[in-house]
Regions:
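Canonical Rossmann dinucleotide-binding motif of NAD(H)/NADP(H)-dependent dehydrogenases/reductases
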Residues: 443-473
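Glycine-rich flexible loops
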Residues: 1-448, 460
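Short C-terminal tail/terminal secondary-structure segment
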Residues: 547-550, 702, 713-729
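Catalytic Tyr-X3-Lys loop
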Residues: 537, 557-573, 593, 617, ...
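Short, small/polar-rich loop/turn modules that mediate ligand/substrate recognition or access, typified
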Residues: 629-633, 712-714
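Substrate-binding pocket helix/loop in short-chain dehydrogenase/reductase
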Residues: 551-553, 557-562, 682
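Residue(s) in the substrate-gating loop at a strand-loop-helix junction
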Residues: 597
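Active-site helix of classical SDR
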Residues: 576, 613, 621
Length: 729
């Protein structure tokens, strides 16, 4: 079969070398790699495999199924749970004895805890809520996907009729039923009543299908999606295609430059208002598909209906916030006013939804702010606790838009009833999963720009704070160096599971940007790019600096003097002055950490410009603390003699210092050896007798950027190993 709507990726040469579990993982990965087949984190796969029981030595049938959490695209063996198939089937007898059973009853939820009793070979992976769906279908291999095309059929008003029209008797339709034990039993009945059926369209949910051969199951999944997609696209084109989608366009898209300008202007302000309870990280989506939707006549109606697939609204909430702004005739101030009133109404609507649908044992109401905001002419902004989550949220609403497009093309889109949506969103099992999440790290939900991140202390600071959950904007005059640091971080920590985002917003926990801090326009552009990547920023650490040696006569020329002050003093002021505008718009507490030096309080020959500039930077720290209070704390780190890993100690300066202090060395001696000699000399002068490294400085930056010293501002923290002459007085 030729596939036009999905990617066929099965490779017999690969699978022939894999064991049965590895084949399941392979199947899962290639299914999950195509967003048209399933969304990130959505769907699950299984195989019933004969294994030797470690207790009895006998062969038993084991269900291997994608466990709770995780993502098909990136899943490995440890992401799959393994359970005795017969024990899972036997749970039906236990369930049958419950006096009060049925959908959404305590008896049904009780079964979830029983899955652990069926664990095979002490596999620690928690079982998915969908485990019964896979166990109770009497076939070896099962794929449960959330394809946009299939959900479009499932979310159509006449879904049952459309399923029959598209698939005949090959696929059976079932009405909405919350995932769990009852849905597993319902699928078991379908298989018994329709022995020739190959799959089921789950009303307002997705697709599930099966086979006794894993390759056949994979190909069946693709062919069923292909049939639905072909049916939808034929109807879509007959209705006028893109030109008539969602009732046709009502507004026109702003050009790319103007979109970036408006996003840069509104996002910090918007982030501050949606982050009243918890800080959010943003993702922009302004591709052709999302713009077609937000600009359309039907967008307000469809957005208000909300999403359908359970996976979607767990991230996107019951509905997005749509702002009816005319990009051709209204300005940014009008947009802010409409956003403000829209946010107020959204919170009221969410509270009303909660109070209307809550049950006696429902968890407390969660953050009432929207996680998806739709703006004509601009696109979509999605919010999450970190970049990966906000990208997943954006992806899910991308999928929701495709579902609505398909459903409207073939029929009429209907959303899941609000009570059903609430019972998923506030399901006690979901709440328990949230409560089991580890505590957030000290810099979680924070966006921090590190200026000077291409080398030395700045690079070390970037690595230190991302370890604690920060999103890091690696900034350097040398763009290649900034990008290299960002790549090191991304390679180490990954980009997360989200795949959405456009432009700079298509990023992970770190981005690399270039900026010249002596050029105000360059600084503003860098800060705007930071906003476009993450929606705003919280703190800035400035480690960029310069040391200019005197000429051979010991004189500092005027241009070198000016350059030293431009970088070491004025640059920090320019960054602070520009950042202050964004901080004020955002209205969230932040930090600014400068780099001064122990030299700022120690007069000596040979470093007149540098020492004087750092003395000015010390006082700049105090002045900025006054200017930016109470919103922003301003402190500084004063390093001394950081030789190893420092861009300020190139080989020629190291040699000059060795000669100055009469430390023996050879001209052809390796740079590393020369650096170690100088570092040890400096260490021996300190009270702690310890070499000072970039990592030592990074620790001080980290502490100042956290809440650990939340009552400290206007201070300089010296990290010099203990130079008594540099004690601050």
């Amino acid at each position: 079969m030729n596939y036009r709507r999905v990617n066929y990726l099965w490779d017999d040469d690969v699978t022939s070398k894999l064991d049965p579990v590895e084949r399941l993982i392979y199947r899962s990965n290639i299914l999950g790699s195509d967003q048209r087949i399933t969304n990130t984190g959505g769907g699950n796969t299984s195989s019933k495999i004969t294994k030797q029981d470690p207790l009895t030595g006998e062969n038993v049938e084991v269900l291997w199924v994608k466990g709770s959490g995780g993502d098909l695209r990136t899943s490995k063996r440890e992401n799959f749970s393994s359970l005795y198939q017969q024990k899972l089937v036997d749970l039906q007898k236990l369930y049958a004895k419950e006096p009060e059973k049925g959908p959404k009853t305590p008896a049904e939820d009780k079964m979830v805890a029983m899955y652990t009793h069926a664990t095979f070979n002490l596999n620690p992976r928690a079982s998915s809520i969908d485990t019964p769906l896979h166990s109770f279908i009497p076939f070896k291999h099962v794929d449960h996907m959330h394809p946009n095309a299939a959900i479009a059929v499932a979310a159509a008003k006449n879904s049952e009729r459309l399923t029959k029209e598209i698939y005949g008797d090959e696929v059976i339709w079932t009405p909405w039923l919350r995932p769990g034990f009852e849905l597993g039993l319902a699928l078991q009945r379908v298989c018994a009543e329709h022995p020739n059926a190959k799959g089921v369209i789950l009303g307002q949910h997705g697709l599930i299908n099966w086979a006794n051969d894993d390759k056949e199951c994979y190909e069946l999944t693709l062919s069923l999606i292909e049939k639905a997609a072909n049916y939808i696209e034929a109807k879509y084109e007959r209705k006028g295609g893109d030109a008539k989608a969602f009732g046709g366009p009502k507004y026109q898209t702003l050009d790319e430059v103007r979109r970036s300008q408006v996003f840069a202007a509104i996002l910090p302000w918007l982030r501050g208002r949606v982050s009243q309870k918890n800080r959010f990280i943003g993702t922009i989506q302004d591709d052709e598909n999302i713009l077609r939707f937000v600009n359309s006549s039907d967008a307000p109606r469809l957005a208000e209906l909300g999403t359908s697939c359970p996976d979607h609204f767990l991230r996107t909430k019951i509905k997005p916030l749509y702002v009816d702004w005319n990009p051709q005739s209204e300005d940014v101030d009008v947009l802010k006013k409409k956003l403000q009133s829209g946010l107020q109404k959204y919170r009221q609507d969410y509270a009303a939804y909660y109070n209307r649908c809550k049950r006696p044992n429902s968890p407390a109401m969660r953050d009432p702010n929207p996680t998806v905001i739709l703006i004509p002419g601009l696109g979509m902004v999605a919010w999450g606790k970190d970049k990966s989550e906000s990208r997943v949220t954006a992806e899910f609403y991308n999928c929701a838009v495709e579902v609505m497009r398909g459903a409207e093309a073939i029929d009429q889109y209907i959303a899941l009833p609000q009570q059903e949506a609430f019972d998923i969103e506030y399901w006690l099992l979901e709440e328990a999963k949230l409560q089991r999440m580890p505590a957030e790290k000290s810099l979680a939900r924070q966006v921090i720009a590190v200026i000077g991140a291409g080398s030395g202390i700045g690079k070390e600071v970037a690595h230190r704070i991302v370890k604690e959950g920060a999103h890091v904007v690696c900034v350097d005059l040398n763009k290649d160096a900034a990008l290299a640091t960002a790549k090191e971080i991304t390679d180490k920590y990954g980009v997360g599971i989200g795949v959405a985002g456009t432009g700079l917003s298509d990023c992970g926990p770190a981005v690399g940007l270039s900026a010249n801090i002596t050029d105000r326009a360059s600084v503003r552009a860098m800060l705007n790019d930071t906003v476009l990547a993450y929606g705003g920023f919280d703190s800035i650490a400035i480690t960029a600096g310069i040391f200019v040696s005197p000429d051979t006569t010991g004189h500092i020329p005027d241009d070198k003097w000016g350059l030293t002050f431009a970088i070491n003093v004025t640059g920090s002021y320019v960054v602070a002055d520009e950042a202050a505008k964004t901080w004020q718009e955002q209205g969230l507490q932040g930090n600014l950490v400068l780099t001064t030096s122990a030299n700022a309080v120690v007069a000596k020959k040979g470093s007149l410009a540098y020492d004087t500039s750092k003395a000015a930077a010390n006082h700049l720290t105090r002045e900025l603390a006054m200017e930016l209070a109470p919103l922003v704390r301003v402190n500084a780190v004063a390093p001394a003699t950081v030789v190893q890993g420092s861009a300020m100690f190139p080989r020629d300066r190291v040699i000059a210092s060795l000669a100055k202090y009469k430390i023996p060395y050879a001209e052809d001696e390796p740079t590393e050896s020369l650096t170690q000699k100088l570092a040890q000399f400096y260490a021996d002068r300190t009270l702690t007798r310890s070499p000072i490294t970039p990592a030592d400085q990074a620790e001080a930056f980290y502490i100042l950027l956290t809440k650990a010293l939340s009552k400290t501002t206007g201070q300089v923290i010296t990290v010099d190993g203990g130079l008594h002459e540099a004690f601050l007085r």
